[in-house]
Amino acid sequence: MEPSLQASRRTLLRLAAAGAAGGAIAAAPLPAFAATGADRCPLPRTLSVTAPGLYPEGVAWDPRRKAFLVGSTAQGTISVVRADGSLSVLVAPFARVSVIGIQVDAVRGSIQAAYSDYFFRRLGMVDTSLPPVNGVGSFDLATGAVRQLVPVSTGESEPRTNDVTTDRHGDIYVTDTEADTITRVSREGEVLQVIRDDRFTADGTGPNGIVAHPAGYLLMGKYDGGRLFRIDHPRSARPVVREVRLDRAPASIDGLALRPDGSLVVVVNDLSLPGGAGGRDAVVVLRSTDGWRTARTLRDQTWPLADPTTVAVTPYGDYVVSGGLREILTGVPSTTPGQFQLRRR
């Protein structure tokens, strides 16, 4: 995403000030949702949330609260969004960063979040003589307290972590769309490995949404070109990367989420496509019958809300977030100022 620097700098300053005054989500194993009478918690088709300056890119479902969690690109927070549209901050700002992809690990009572000062650095809002702030954080799901902040650096001058997932062993995987990498981090916070492949490389936006499959491999989407990869043996010294052959490749792949039935929800937008607007916003559902060597399109739905970025799987449907990121990227005012939307597909 290449922001219009002057306009975007004004926008981020304004949004950060507003906040001071006041972001593919799948764990292993896949959740087995059951809407029993005691668990029933109906959600509206669309939640329009008033939150000036929040601008979420990532969303996750919190099964304990039966509520959504959203990150803030402008304020560096993680907030709880309840079924009535009310919002409260759970994780307070811990640095001048964007919180991008987030994931709930209910088994370990934690939230994982990719964070980066990429946008602030690009806009000259942080001291660029200092090293970039870029990493993956773990936070207490109950209290929001910081458990650990793990710097992730591969030597890039402007790294940008994007999405995060956790496997059944507790290892954390975070994508970097500028470094074109996937980094594996132990649950204790040690950087264990950086996974690279020539096919991850992009002139624009590279590795993006990522999910851990219960069978032990990863699925990762590359934004540019809409390519999907399966990474086998990600905990070994030599992971094996295979491209998933799609019947219809989308123009881009942003957020991903695995559903309990094994299908994969893919969010498509034109936020980072060359030239900006001109692509399409869509939500695509893919299914594989051969362990994600190939996949076919079950549904390709043009999305009615602008600039969707990712999706949260809940017991009550799959909810896609439209956080108004184009305003941060271009400085052009949102058509729904001070609001973001969560909509069921």
Regions found by a protein language model. Name each.
Residues 44-49, 86-92, 147-153, 192-201, ...:
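A short beta-strand motif characteristic of beta-propeller blades
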Residues 51-65, 94-119, 153-172, 199-218, ...:
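Beta-rich, blade/repeat-based domains predominating
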